[in-house]
């Protein structure tokens, strides 16, 4: 692969992930997975592990930073757990793609996710989560919410003195434990009355509560503000209510940046639930619509691979009788399918027949 060059964000049609799929059966084997140092000893006990892709390599992400990611990076997340009433370990492995991650990083993260599954004897349910479109399962891993900062991890989280600090605007949105904290451009167009924002000016911190914001967003922002003050010592903070402050306030006059077209939630509420049979037997990706609307487990055939797309999640169901290559290519199939839809960034969940997936069962029943 060529060197890492920052590409146009989420330019899925130019991504080479589709090509990555055709090579998986040949190159992702248990033997090669055993040679990856990052996988040594993983999946042997219940818990969460996270890695970041750095120069095509899998590097361990510090546990203290779990739940904090950079939009310029790609990560792999492994959750090891036990199903109720069972002793054997079960696995969900995700790769998370930042909005400014490169195409190369995207492909390496996808490839290594499949390799990790091979290391775990193909026992994992595979997921793709894109920034701004994370699944509820992904968000559930982080009790303190998900924090997404601009740039890459080489910038560090807490290594800048307050007097040298570059102003930033943090957006708090969500409910209960599913609060997402995201750094957004310093521009007034980013403000939303139903959310909470923190303006970080280094020694001065403002919490802006939108008129329609909820108590969970306000509480999370307050906690975040307290942590920033504790880190910086001399910093002062003030809480502002949208309906009570004038546009001449420093909070507003500090928002002088330009807006960017960052990815938003792409859930397609108008989408019709669709079941497709997929294959690459002819040497290229091919999908055939089997059914739309009401879909049942009886519509699935264990000899094939199917995609179930309901507009909010793209499920890949792999039958036990599918070929080895088809079993490996689930993520590539889903990527190729989603490229052609209005919702290319929705979560992907790939699992095999017999693996427990409450999300898939719920999608069938809906």
UniProtKB/Swiss-Prot annotation:
CC terms in the record's Gene Ontology section: actin cytoskeleton; cytoplasm
Subunit architecture: Interacts with actin monomers and filaments.
Organism: Lumbricus terrestris
Lineage: Eukaryota, Metazoa, Spiralia, Lophotrochozoa, Annelida
Function: Calcium-regulated protein that binds to the plus (or barbed) ends of actin monomers or filaments, preventing monomer exchange (end-blocking or capping). Can promote the assembly of monomers into filaments (nucleation) as well as sever existing filaments.
Gelsolin-like repeats by residue range: 55-139, 177-252, 286-327
Single GO term (MF): actin filament binding
Tissues where this protein is expressed: Expressed in circular and longitudinal muscle, pseudohearts, pharynx and gizzard. Not expressed in seminal vesicles.
Residue numbers spanned by region Actin-actin interfilament contact point: 104-107
Region (Actin binding): 100-116
Protein name: Gelsolin-like protein 2
InterPro entries membership: ADF-H/Gelsolin-like_dom_sf (IPR029006), Gelsolin-like_dom (IPR007123), Gelsolin-like_dom_sf (IPR036180), Villin/Gelsolin (IPR007122)
Keyword set, alphabetical order: Actin capping, Actin-binding, Calcium, Cytoplasm, Cytoskeleton, Repeat
Location relative to the cell: Cytoplasm, Cytoskeleton
Main location, first listed in the record: cytoplasm
